[in-house]
Amino acid sequence: HLEQVFTDHGVTYTRTGVTEKNLKPDFILPGIVHYHDATFPQARLTMLASKSTCKDRWRQILNEAERIPNKHLLTLEPSISENQTCEMQAERVQLVLPRRLHSTYTPEQQTWLMDVAAFIDLVRQRQLA
């Protein structure tokens, strides 16, 4: 599904490209070749992990792409606890959710959540820079 969304919006990406320690993040945008190119600006790189549910598994993404300090995590899990989302923020993990799930989070959490459209806009801006 995500790959189709990326294609529909003209977003380039690599699925499960290999990074440090032979790790394979779900998506590197614009691509793994750019990730490994030391001259490519770090600010234009994006990593997106995709997990249908998070629980404590979200921490697995923290070391998947060392060049990208701010990670994005797409999930379909409603109402993750405030403790968990505070930990995510502290670890620089931005939660991305379909807009319809935002209402399952507290008003304070909702101010920080990103929807899929905003993620696509961010990535497109980075790819056009």
Where are these regions (language model features)?
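Catalytic core segments in nucleotide and nucleic-acid processing enzymes
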Residues: 7-129
